[in-house]
Amino acid sequence: MTQKFEMADRFNPSAVEQALYQHWEESGYFKPSGNENAPSYCIAIPPPNVTGSLHMGHAFQQTLMDTLIRFNRMEGHNTLWQAGTDHAGIATQMVVERKIGAEEGKTRHDYGREAFINKIWDWKAYSGGTISQQMRRLGNSIDWERERFTMDDGLSNAVKEVFVRLHEEGLIYRGKRLVNWDPKLHTAISDLEVENKESKGSLWHFRYPLANGAKTADGKDYLVVATTRPETMLGDTAVAVHPEDERYQSLIGKTVVLPLANREIPIIADEYVDREFGTGVVKITPAHDFNDYEVGKRHGLPMVNVLTLNADIRDEAEIIGTDGKPLAGYEATIPADYRGLERFAARKKIVADFESLGLLDEIKPHDLKVPYGDRGGVPIEPMLTDQWYVSVKPLADVAIKAVEDCEIQFVPKQYENLYFSWMRDIQDWCISRQLWWGHRIPAWYDTEGNVYVARNETEVRSKYNLDFAVELKQDEDVLDTWFSSGLWTFSTLGWPEQTKELKMFHPTDVLITGFDIIFFWVARMIMFTMHFVKDENGKPQVPFKTVYVTGLIRDEQGQKMSKSKGNVLDPIDMIDGISLDDLLEKRTGNMMQPQLAEKIAKATRKEFADGIAAHGTDALRFTLAALASNGRDINWDMKRLEGYRNFCNKLWNASRFVLTNDKLDLSEGEIEFSLADRWIQSEFNRTVETFRNSLSQYRFDLCANAIYEFTWNQFCDWYLELTKPVFANGNAAQIRAASQTLVHVLEKLLRLAHPLIPFITEEIWQKVKGFVGITADSIMLQPFPQVEESGFDLEAEAEIEWLKEVIVAVRNIRAESNIAPSKGLDLLFRNLSTENAKILEKQTALLKAMAKLDNVQVLAANETAPLAVAKLVGNAELLVPMAGFINKEAELARLTKEIEKYQNEVKRIENKLSNEAFVAKAPEAVIAKEREKQAEYQSGLEKIQEQYKAIEAL
């Protein structure tokens, strides 16, 4: 029976993607099956920040996650992709502060805390909606009814529960320690939010007079101290030398007089000092330097804080002991001349005063890294402040063991070492932030400063037996964003309640994330989860079994994408396309550094002169998967994106060729499978095996390559061509076999490719399913192809491979000799093996049809061949007689001209590259391009010379 069928000439992604997604979502296909007898599979999405929109890094990681989710759903697993967004404390607060500043000329203080937080909730509703819509456009098969937010009621309760429990266990405490302080934003920030910028600075060499008549080994009455931070010297509490530095050993234990402040401070010995740095003597300022802080703790030094939270010089120094409490009895007066000075103004004055006192020895240029707050944009200050901390060492020990014991595996494995290096040197974690947006710390103070920790004020009064007459005020600070993010895998499943979902889907299966947050997020999730979530036997649960670490998506030049560089690409623009004008507006509008706009506009016009064409979601997803080689950074490639859009069109056209073939016969009756039918089924089985093996190793690039290779090179370029002679001249049984093979392989191919390219596969599958007798609603719910152990046909694979080599050799001879495909050729074989002779005997008709041959002959061992062009296939020699096909003299004349042309080009480039002036001045990229052209011309020349010899021999 022949089925009549019509199908559009081209696949139009914009016409089908959103409708298909809506159908999937409304049909509930993204929800877990709820089948408790099936294995569960769960991924918790790294929650995007609600600060704006998704970037290419999100699209990359989410494509990989959705591939795994769709694959496992098709495997029949009870599958959940748990999604949500992160409140992203400091980032979101800054976005909204900038917004009200630009639009209303107001600050958050004009609004007050409660009203400002309401403004942020409004922003979250808008931005979170944008993010979820973008995720839908990417095809993400998320159970949207389970979407969470790190500050929703359930997660807020989980955060309070964790804080209170850790405090009750003595693992959360409040203390005065050194933190990264942003003097512009007035908050402590994490190391992740500190950006170290290369800077041309100075190394000042100051003279610190020795006290009590002491002298150096060479008779000087002072030590020369090298520093990059003169403004903090008022807080010095020691100078340090290396214990083995013979220049200063006699002075260890003596004192110097701190200039300007006129107080004595000790000379101490510590191995931290680099004898080769400066003079080998350094000032120790424990209140204003992280390394000095550690030295100070080792030596019991007081900490003298001389800076305000604005980073101005204080009126009175704050003196703290190593226990973080005020220290009585230590005198450290700040001279009146410096009080109230901004830190860098103080630097200038201090240097000038050293010089006027004759205590400035020298100033040397010095390259250094200055820590900046990545959002405030000003240099951060190590600052002694009262903060809340988690004592994480007990949690870290358990988390380290989980990775050592392979309960959690990192892919690629080398990232385990990064994890271990951080975790084995872990410090207590500062979890408080001086912000308004975030989880308010569940601690209350009475008027005397006593601290009470509980889930809410009512519980505080009950827990601590406080009368309502006792006035309580909640801590103003909020928790570090990473604190709530650290609970993500289990809090989203209902913890602290012991829910069915928590039991069913935890531990989750894999976390896909970037290497830059292994410590800040991944490690903290492992620590928190293993501390709070236990299995039925009381054993700590891991949050996930595998951590797949991706590289960064960079631009085509390998630069990190950033707004300031103007090289950010929006994944939705890859899908829908964007005009040049709109792209320019997107890249240069509302810039923090408007002076860069023209440079960015110029680069954008050069790279995207016609804007960006629409490519559709499937092409974007396939490109991202194909570029996902394990752990490496990825240079984005628009040509690859274009190539994979062409691949999607190739799949559409191949499907159209199959389904609109009016000779397709799927009726019941005798079938006779051809060699080609057997071969393509075996090739498909091998492709399924490759895909499954690759996916199990998170080699998404190899999965994409397997599908591409089979679809384009085997199915389209070969099998479809191999069926044409069958439909033209085959008997009914052969046509039925080819028809069945075509539609069944196509249908299985669509299922194989669906996790990577869901839209086009669903659209084609809806058209194919009737041909194979399927009535199901969606490809999403169909089983993923299995490897069939009996499905490998090694004989068919070997025979077709040999025939392909022969056909390609004949086609190459045609191309090289300018013989039209329509002209029949004779083909002679010499030195043909017995095995290949048998293949030839069985498949002569197929070979004639595919290579457009009139006659095929095997020459006897002593038989003389006519003059012919020869090619080797293995040990066999293929000969195509040329008599009558070409005008020998004319062809040799034409080839002579071509040879001269190529020789001239090779010579021209050789001269250019041997020109020392050119090589010295030209950019490396230009020289590389010339060498590339030289190789191309040389290769072309050699091929034409081979053709010349072949024709000359006729």
Swiss-Prot record:
Give the GO cellular component terms, alphabetically. cytosol
Transmembrane residue ranges: none
**Motif 'KMSKS' region: where in chain:** 560-564
Q: Which organism is it from?
A: Haemophilus influenzae (strain PittEE)
**Which cysteines are cross-linked by disulfides?**
none
Which reaction is this enzyme known to catalyze? tRNA(Val) + L-valine + ATP = L-valyl-tRNA(Val) + AMP + diphosphate
Q: Write out the annotated subcellular location.
A: Cytoplasm
Q: Which EC number(s) does UniProt give?
A: 6.1.1.9
Q: What is known of its domains?
A: ValRS has two distinct active sites: one for aminoacylation and one for editing. The misactivated threonine is translocated from the active site to the editing site. The C-terminal coiled-coil domain is crucial for aminoacylation activity.
From the UniProt record, which GO molecular function terms apply? aminoacyl-tRNA deacylase activity; ATP binding; valine-tRNA ligase activity
Short motif 'HIGH' region, span:
48-58
Report quaternary structure and partners. Monomer.
| Job of this protein | Catalyzes the attachment of valine to tRNA(Val). As ValRS can inadvertently accommodate and process structurally similar amino acids such as threonine, to avoid such errors, it has a 'posttransfer' editing activity that hydrolyzes mischarged Thr-tRNA(Val) in a tRNA-dependent manner.
* HAMAP family tied to this protein: Val_tRNA_synth_type1
- Give the record's keywords alphabetically: Aminoacyl-tRNA synthetase, ATP-binding, Coiled coil, Cytoplasm, Ligase, Nucleotide-binding, Protein biosynthesis
| Protein name listed in UniProt | Valine--tRNA ligase
Could you say which protein family the record assigns here? Belongs to the class-I aminoacyl-tRNA synthetase family. ValS type 1 subfamily.
